[in-house]
Swiss-Prot record:
Entry's EC annotation: 7.1.1.2
Family: Belongs to the complex I 30 kDa subunit family.
HAMAP family: NDH1_NuoC
GO molecular function: NADH dehydrogenase (ubiquinone) activity
GO CC annotations, alphabetized: mitochondrial inner membrane
Protein name, as recorded: NADH-ubiquinone oxidoreductase subunit 9
Catalytic activity: a ubiquinone + NADH + 5 H(+)(in) = a ubiquinol + NAD(+) + 4 H(+)(out)
Pfam families given in the database record: Complex1_30kDa
Protein role: Core subunit of the mitochondrial membrane respiratory chain NADH dehydrogenase (Complex I) that is believed to belong to the minimal assembly required for catalysis. Complex I functions in the transfer of electrons from NADH to the respiratory chain. The immediate electron acceptor for the enzyme is believed to be ubiquinone.
Domain of life: Eukaryota
Lineage, highest ranks first: Eukaryota, Discoba, Jakobida, Histionina, Histionidae
Class in the EC hierarchy, top level: translocase
Gene3D superfamilies: NADH:ubiquinone oxidoreductase, 30kDa subunit
Length: 204
């Protein structure tokens, strides 16, 4: 399938999906050769089942699942699902939006790959996935506090993890935010060049 034909197919496919399942899809956006569907968290599983099992869809592969944090928005977390249809050689993106307290239903019942993806989003952003079989941290250390990919998470973190040579083990200590004295009295490179001034005599 040529690129122009594929783009036209995705446009028509998006229109058809909205007509067939208007109660599941809030919005369909086609931009730069990509189709994106917006869905409420409560309708996520139903829409994913359709996209995976419908004869004209066959998006059986979840190639990626990630999150984006927009602190200025009421529903600050944007959860993004990237699906692939090998049969029709096409991709589609599904987005849902939640705040800090609203959970998202897990899609592990449909896509096995979602297990680690959802754990990563939970670990880094704090988005909770209901009905996940093993929702634990996956990248940060045991006992880690907070979710480091949130925009309001401090760059230095809350604690320091280091190896103590005396105790011969890894220790966790509260982070001291005191800053060492720094001298900002730097000489400008232009000030190092002495320019001789012309000898100007006053006229009497």
């Amino acid at each position: 399938m040529k690129k122009q034909e594929q783009n036209q197919f995705l446009k028509e496919f998006g229109i058809s999906l909205i007509k067939m399942f208007p109660k599941y899809i809030d919005k369909a956006i086609y931009s730069k050769g990509e189709l994106t569907l917006h869905v409420k968290p409560t309708n996520l599983i139903a829409l994913m089942k359709i996209l995976k099992n419908h004869t004209n869809c066959q998006f059986k592969s979840l190639s990626d699942l990630c999150a984006v944090d927009f602190p200025e928005k009421k529903e600050r977390f944007e959860i993004v699902y990237n699906l692939l249809s090998v049969r029709y050689n096409s991709r589609i993106r599904v987005k849902t939006f939640v705040d800090e307290l609203t959970p998202v239903p897990s899609v592990t019942c449909l896509f096995q790959a979602a297990g680690w993806f959802e754990r990563e989003v939970w670990d880094l952003f704090g988005v909770y996935f209901t009905n996940h079989p093993d929702l634990r941290r996956i990248l940060t250390d045991y006992g880690f506090e907070g979710h480091p990919m949130r925009k309001d998470f401090p760059l230095t973190g809350y604690v320091e993890v280091r190896y103590d040579d005396e105790q011969k083990r890894v220790v966790t200590e509260s982070l001291e935010m005191t800053q060492e004295f720094r001298s900002f009295n730097f000489t400008s490179p232009w000030e190092q060049i002495e320019i001789s001034k012309p000898n100007i005599k006053e006229k009497k």
